[in-house]
Amino acid sequence: RAGLAPYTYFADAGAKMYSAQDSWLTALPGAQRTAAAFELMYRLGKEYEKPEFGIHGVEIDGVECPVVERVDMSKPFCRLLRFKRYSDNEDRLRDLKDDPTVLVVAPLSGHHATLLRDTVRTLLIDHKVYITDWTDARMVPAEQGPFRLDDYVAYVQDFIRHIGCDNLHVVSVCQPTVPVLAAVSLMAARGE
């Protein structure tokens, strides 16, 4: 990727030159298409930073409850994040402890789990929330080996066992539906 950096910067400059309103290049035939091609090259080559979840609190029954994000389990290809709600009110704390638990299994590829922050924020109102945070495959050392479907299923099973509660709901978003169904089916067949 570092070798592509000069081309990425060049593509960004080209897109701006062919689309800037005060540039004479915009008057040339095909300028819009050229700008679009440069923009595409730029977007394919640029580095996208992983945004933060940024959930520090959630309003429950009109009262703001602080939320702390923490890594609950870490594996080479994924981290299991927990969003823990806090309260100084004993009654509210008791209610929070009685809430059901949900594991959100985010897609492995295509985007970061942080795009589900609104889903997590909404679930936090009346659930204990965990979410999978998959590691970019480029960042996993090659000695960890490949990550196949059976590994994916095993990760989901490990996360479910780690959470280990009687009232657990699992929500898969798009692509992980098949591995999640396989994981819970295998666990159910074993009586887990």
What does each of the following model-derived ranges do?
Residues 143-145:
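Short, solvent-exposed loop/turn segments at secondary-structure boundaries
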Residues 103, 133, 168-183:
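Catalytic nucleophile loop
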Residues 121, 185-189:
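Short, well-ordered alpha-helices that flank and scaffold nucleotide-derived cofactor binding pockets
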Residues 1-63, 94:
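N-terminal targeting or regulatory segments adjacent to alpha/beta-hydrolase or S9 domains
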Residues 47, 52-59, 63-140:
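Short, surface-exposed "cap/lid" segments of acyl-processing enzymes
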Residues 148-152, 175-176:
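Phosphate/oxyanion-binding active-site loops and adjacent basic polyanion-contact surfaces
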Residues 171, 190-192:
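A conserved short beta-strand
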